[in-house]
């Protein structure tokens, strides 16, 4: 995959996002911030859009059983890029949804109320997989973001990249918002853009320091450090399903995944364009192997979402 001009990419993404929000007369951009690289890059894009349009970026960190390092980085990102940022714990919302599921299925027979149960008890009672429970967490977060957007007359920003889309590595009604600035970028390109932004903010901080603009210097230092901290995190879905995204996919690196997908997709599109029958298992077997093949077949080729239908 060829190296992109990330300065140009960033400017194009900012312009397209600004055009969308202004042409639709939206009053706010609402973004869920996990601390991961995707939401961090989208936050940086929306921050620039906000500077150009005066449309505020409203960020929320919505922890549910999150790891401490993810939570701390989400705060760095939110405080660096958002016009309004808040941490709001949705553990009670998740627990209430589990309780309602159990009650609806007739699994709660002792007339005990919501407060009598631990989350782990309710998860066990449903008999659902960790993936299914992870999807419920994602949907709790998305519902909250859409409620905020409704009140503020805004839209919810998506944070899915092309790699996740092609693999089906997303949750229906849990990940996809109204507008996605990075949907055409592979995961490796998201990292490339993040590295460009980190260096860009660092350079601006040094320039401000040289000119004795301390407040401006501190602002850009915070932005650079937020992006740096996000890049250092091991990518996870934030749902507690596995230790990392790559572990779920069955790959050693995103370079490997993006290389496979970028070779497979033109092959698939050529067959479809020329009206030839598509034999997905045969074609994928040519290009993939092991767990990555199974993951891609179950997600991308099934036209579903890997988290949803398992």
Where are the model-predicted features located?
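Conserved G/P- and acidic residue-centered "switch" motifs that form tight phosphate/ATP-binding loops
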Residues: 36
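ATP/NTP-dependent adenylation/nucleotidyl-transfer catalytic domains that generate, transfer
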Residues: 1-31, 41, 45-48, 53-58, ...
């Amino acid at each position: 995959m060829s190296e992109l001009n990330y300065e140009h990419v960033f400017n194009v993404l900012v312009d397209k996002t600004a055009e969308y929000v202004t042409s639709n007369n939206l009053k706010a951009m609402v973004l869920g911030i996990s601390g991961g690289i995707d939401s961090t890059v989208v936050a940086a894009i929306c921050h620039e859009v906000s500077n150009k349009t005066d449309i505020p970026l409203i960020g929320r960190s919505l922890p549910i059983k999150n790891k401490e390092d993810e939570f701390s980085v989400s705060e760095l990102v939110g405080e660096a890029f958002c016009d309004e940022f808040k941490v709001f714990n949705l553990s009670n919302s998740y627990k209430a949804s589990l309780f309602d599921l159990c009650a609806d299925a007739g699994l709660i027979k002792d007339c005990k109320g919501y407060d009598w149960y631990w989350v782990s008890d309710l998860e066990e009672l449903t008999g659902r997989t960790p993936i299914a429970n992870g999807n419920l967490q994602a949907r709790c977060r998305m519902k909250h973001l859409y409620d905020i957007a409704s009140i503020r007359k805004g839209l919810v920003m998506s944070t899915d990249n092309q790699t996740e889309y092609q693999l089906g590595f997303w949750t229906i009604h849990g990940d996809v918002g109204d507008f996605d600035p990075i949907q055409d970028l592979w995961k490796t390109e998201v990292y490339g853009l993040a590295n460009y932004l980190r260096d860009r903010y660092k350079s601006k901080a040094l320039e401000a320091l040289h000119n004795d603009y301390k407040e401006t210097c501190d602002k850009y230092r915070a932005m650079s450090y937020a992006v740096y901290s996000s890049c250092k995190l091991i990518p996870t879905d934030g749902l507690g399903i596995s230790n990392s995204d790559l572990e779920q996919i069955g790959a050693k690196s995103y370079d490997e995944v993006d290389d496979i997908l970028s070779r497979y997709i033109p092959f698939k599109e050529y067959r479809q364009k020329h009206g030839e029958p598509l034999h997905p298992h045969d074609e994928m077997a040519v290009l993939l192997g092991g767990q990555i093949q199974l993951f891609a077949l179950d997600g991308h080729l099934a036209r579903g979402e890997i988290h949803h239908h398992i």
